């Protein structure tokens, strides 16, 4: 997989984890055989065998169940001394973004923390597009270390 494909996959996953897909996005996926080949035979079959309305309903149910009702796709939930989720500069992920020129504004989004998986995948997409392999590895290493603590 080349960097363009990797960046596309990171961008797609960032979108999927941030909100339910719009009917337009579902139609784009349904009409993109190369992408369906990339994400697998079962996904291709699911998109080929269902119309846009059924796909919208099924994917909305899955998104709501997986990411809103049962849990949020937040990787580590960094908490402070009061056990509240750290959303600003006290969150080490936010500091890593800032140190590496990746600015996010959580005020205009439903994503609550900088370590939301959609934001992390968007960051990885930017790193792939910049071809900064060292920073990609540093980010993944630091995230792995934080999960072990």
Model-based region annotation:
Residues 1-148:
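Surface/interface-facing alpha-helical segments and adjacent flexible terminal/loop regions used
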């Amino acid at each position: 997989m080349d960097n363009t494909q990797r960046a596309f996959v990171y961008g797609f996953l960032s979108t999927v984890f941030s909100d339910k897909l719009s009917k337009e996005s579902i139609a784009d996926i349904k009409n993109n055989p190369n992408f369906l080949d990339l994400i697998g035979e079962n996904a291709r079959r699911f998109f080929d065998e269902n119309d846009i309305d059924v796909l919208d309903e099924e994917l909305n149910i899955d998104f709501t169940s997986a990411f809103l009702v049962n849990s949020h796709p937040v990787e580590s939930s960094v908490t402070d001394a009061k056990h509240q989720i750290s959303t600003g500069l006290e969150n080490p992920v936010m500091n890593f973004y800032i140190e590496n020129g990746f600015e996010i504004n959580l005020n205009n989004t439903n994503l609550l923390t900088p370590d939301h998986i959609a934001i992390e995948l968007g960051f990885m997409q930017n790193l792939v597009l910049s071809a900064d392999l060292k920073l990609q590895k540093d980010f993944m290493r630091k995230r792995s270390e934080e999960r072990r603590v």
